[in-house]
Amino acid sequence: MPSEVTPKVPERPSRRKTSELFPLSGSESGDIKANSEPPTPAGTPNVPTRRPILKAKTMTSFESGMDQESLPKVPLQRPVRRSTTEELNNVMNNTSKELEEIESLISKHNIHNVSRKKSPTSVEEGKVAAIHQNGQRSASDNKTSTNPSPLEKNEHEGAEGNESAISPSNLVNKSNNEVTEHSDSEDLTEKQKVHAALDNEAGDRSHFEEKLIPGDMKVQVDVSKDVEEGSLNALPPSGITESDDKAEKFTKHPESSLEELQKHQEQQEEKIFQNPTDEESTTSLNEKQEGKDNMEVNSQPQGPSDTETVIAATSSNVPSQIASEEENDVPVIPRSRPKKDFEAHVQKEELPNTQEKRVSEECDSTLISTEEESKIPKIPSERPKRRAPPPVPKKPSSRIAAFQEMLQKQQQQDLHNNGNSSATTASADIAKKHTDSSITSDTTKADFTSKLNGLFALPGMVNPGQLPPSLEKKLSSPDTESKLGPQDQSQAKTGPLGGTRRGRGPRGRKLPSKVASVEKIEEDDNTNKIEIFNNWNVSSSFSKEKVLIDTTPGEQAERALDEKEKLPANAESDPLSQLPQTNTVGNRKAISEESLSPSEAITNRDQNDTTEIQEQQMEEQMEVDMERELSGGYEDVDSALHSEEASFHSL
């Protein structure tokens, strides 16, 4: 391929690099300058590459531009808060002096005639003074800084830009002030002079309080971050809201303003040391006036001077906040009582009286009209309509009518039967009461069950009104059965039982053969079967004790040895079972001689006690034999019988 067709790859674009916080080496800084963009023309303002670090917003930075600190000093110890009780006690003790001082101030300044509102011309002149002081403060800061840092340079540039932007407005304000100087000087009254004096005292006192506060306990004040950076360096002092006369002086003589301020501050400090209570009593009123002035200044924006008025408002509020925080606990006594407006009060009192009269007249007229209307009879325009007849009920269907008739008949029958049964029971009870006197105690016990009326149910006992048909037939007499015809009996037999129900299964299908072949059980109610069985049997046998009595002691010993050999374990384990046998030998000998059959013993039980004794002994013997069989003394029952027969034959 030829060289002309090959595409050219462009160079990779270099990224812009801003200046970092830390300085770079010489080679790196050279590369950055080479790759950076060409410088901007000289006519446009220089924009800083990074935002300057905000200075410490302490009281010194707002009021004294000479003493600017980088960081606020944190106090080592927390300030001790004074209790309110101590301050109140001090106020109570020193009230007489304060009252005298307040009276002297009132007599000096004639505060009764002071008006709270300022004229618009004085507000405009205060703005001009604030703008002029900002320019002077920025100039003094630039002179005092011998070795300015790059951050300070940027701040001064921003301040100069702001001054250049504000300059046309300053010229306009100056021209307006020159025109209005003559008119203002003529219109100034005693009230405005008093305002000016109070404003001067408030500003000087705020500056003096800053000096009194130690360095370790300076109060931090937060200012909104929306304020422009250039205007932060040119913050005005706290005493910016001064009188109209001083604003004019500052505009005419800008060079001598600083010297006059210093002299005035020294004079105010001496006054405060001499009578501090005067200043404390006047600060509350001055603060209120300053707040109103700042609100008026903020409510009248005038182009580029808006930012300066906002700054002036924030700076003037700072000392007032500190003073209010210090004097929150001290009660403020008003200079004068408010006067009542007697004319307005009289008008207010007259208005409700007139309204009440009008309301009462209207009520009287309405009452009279209602009474007249009630006397006049009214003829109705329309006749009242007659009520419609009640709706005729529909005839029920034949099935519903038949069902209702059947229910009525059943209810009547039930009522008739209940009445007869109650009458019969009452007559029976009366007859029983008459016969109870002649019946003995045995008959009273027999009648006890009849008085219970079925409270205690016996086995098989059912309420007579709910007996099943099978039991009714058994309990009924044969006369009633004979009265019933063969048809009724067949119906009773074929009637279904209450417990049997048809099992619900799948319809339309045949049942399985196993289920279909099952035969149903039919109960024969009229048949009775008798079964005879033996409850108990009595079997008699010869006892071994009788044989032992007839034998000699030598033969008894031999038989005992033979039994021990056959039953070594059982004979040793049950030695006590043989003791009652030896003890009752004499008794059983007498019983055996007079042995009776069980039937004769039962018949003669009540006549003779010997039969009872014999029965007890027989039971004991049977128990002993059963224990031997269960314990395994004999292997089989046959072996036990053979042993008994052998002992019998030996006799």
UniProtKB/Swiss-Prot annotation:
Residues 110-119, 501-512 have a biased composition (Basic residues). The modification Phosphoserine is found at residues 36, 70, 104, 183, 206, 231, 284, 324, 592, 595, 597, 599, 639, 643, 647, 650. Residues 383-396 are annotated as: Interaction with SH3 domain of ABP1. The keyword Phosphoprotein applies. GO terms for cellular component: actin cortical patch. Residues 1-85, 110-522, 549-651 are annotated as: Disordered. Its main location: cytoplasm. Residues 133-149, 164-178, 296-323, 414-427, 437-452, 575-586, 594-605 have a biased composition (Polar residues). Keywords: Cytoplasm, Cytoskeleton, Phosphoprotein. The modification Phosphothreonine is found at residues 18, 58, 85, 277, 552. It holds the Pfam family Aim21. Residues 9-19, 179-213, 243-272, 339-361, 372-383, 471-482, 556-567, 639-651 have a biased composition (Basic and acidic residues). It comes from the Eukaryota. Coiled coil: none annotated. InterPro entries: Aim21 (IPR021582). It is found in: Cytoplasm, Cytoskeleton, Actin patch. Belongs to the AIM21 family. Involved in mitochondrial migration along actin filaments. Interacts with ribosomes. Interacts with ABP1. This is Altered inheritance of mitochondria protein 21.
